[in-house]
Amino acid sequence: MDFGIALAPGVDAWQTVERAERLGFSHAWFYDTQMLCADVFVAMALAAARTSKIVLGTGVLVPSNRIAPVAANALASLNRLAPGRVVFGVSTGFTARNTMGLGPMKLSELREYVRVVRALLRGDTVECELEGTRRKVRFLNPEAGLIDITHPIPLHLSAFAPKARSLTAEIADGWMNFVTVLPTALQEVEEMAAACRAACRPPDGLYKTGFTLGCVLREGEDAGSRRARAQAGPLVPVIFHAFLERTVDPALLPPELGPAVSAFRAQYETYAPPDARYLQLHKGHLMCVRPEEERFVTPELIRMATFTATAAELRERVRAMAAAGYQQLAVQVVPGQEAALEDWAALAATV
């Protein structure tokens, strides 16, 4: 089982990635959330220049953030810095679009975007739509050595719904999933395997990564400790955000969360301006717990929705994930909580 990290891009994120590489982590995944973080490719380039082994992936690139030729150029430029260590992770958009009041893109738009980016990275001439007109484009002088389209850049799709998983099985080299409750994570990887079989490809040929937040609890430490709240707590409000904005089907809401979601909704309705409440809702998304959200981040929810448990418990979860078909667990490093890297590295050594 590989262990990776996920992180919010910043100009000093390379320090975390360099530290992760020294500790044996296999991958570093960078969020593409332009209204919250620094530019994803700036952060990745700095990390690429200061590391030599760790794989660097966009986790995930959002098509509406940049046109396909620009994305292909950024990936190929990064590949010049870190040949063979770049992964093109992409999806229809969650945080990057919600922070601007937008929902996810259409799968058809994602498919087209991926088609163009991959063709350009192969060195092909490809037709794409630019400003309402179909145009033929290609990299004109890759032989100049300014970019690298020689070393392959694998495609990993983040896919949570059946149609997205079918697309992943059809075109991708890897699948990215966000895991909270272990039984659900195991069910979802089986559904991904079924999609692979339906697409007539062996499930083992698709590299599967589960992303999460969590905390390796020390002896006698509670899930409500300050350390656990800092490392894992930021995921809990995002669950409320998802139900509130209907990113997640409300039918999936556990009955016991009903009162808390109602209270969170009442709080949300106080946000201003009324036509852009998302501006306050998503401030610090997955990076911290805002003061008004603290009361919703209970020890019970931290345990239920994140990978927060003792090392022994987490070891069994990871082994169950590996047995089910996951090849990597990627844990987000919350800003200011980089010391968690040593905890997860110690756990990885025992799995």
Where on the chain are the PLM-derived regions?
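N-terminal beta1-alpha1-beta2 module of alpha/beta enzyme domains
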Residues: M1-T58, I153, V334
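Active-site mouth loops of central-metabolism enzymes
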Residues: M1-V11, L61-P69, I149-F160, G214-R218, ...
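Hydrophobic faces of well-ordered beta-strands that scaffold small-molecule active sites
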Residues: F3-L7, A28-F30, L56-G59, V86-V90, ...
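Acidic-and-aromatic substrate-binding clefts and catalytic sites of carbohydrate-active enzymes
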Residues: L7-D12, D32-D39, P63-P69, L182-L186, ...
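Short, acidic/polar
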Residues: P9-A20, A74, A159-L167, T310-A320
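Conserved, mostly hydrophobic/aromatic
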Residues: G24, A47, L78, V117, ...
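Alpha-helix-loop-beta-strand connector modules within alpha/beta enzyme cores
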Residues: F41-T58, Y113-V116, L120, A345-V351
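An alpha-helical appendage that flanks or caps ligand/catalytic pockets
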Residues: G103-G145, E190-A320
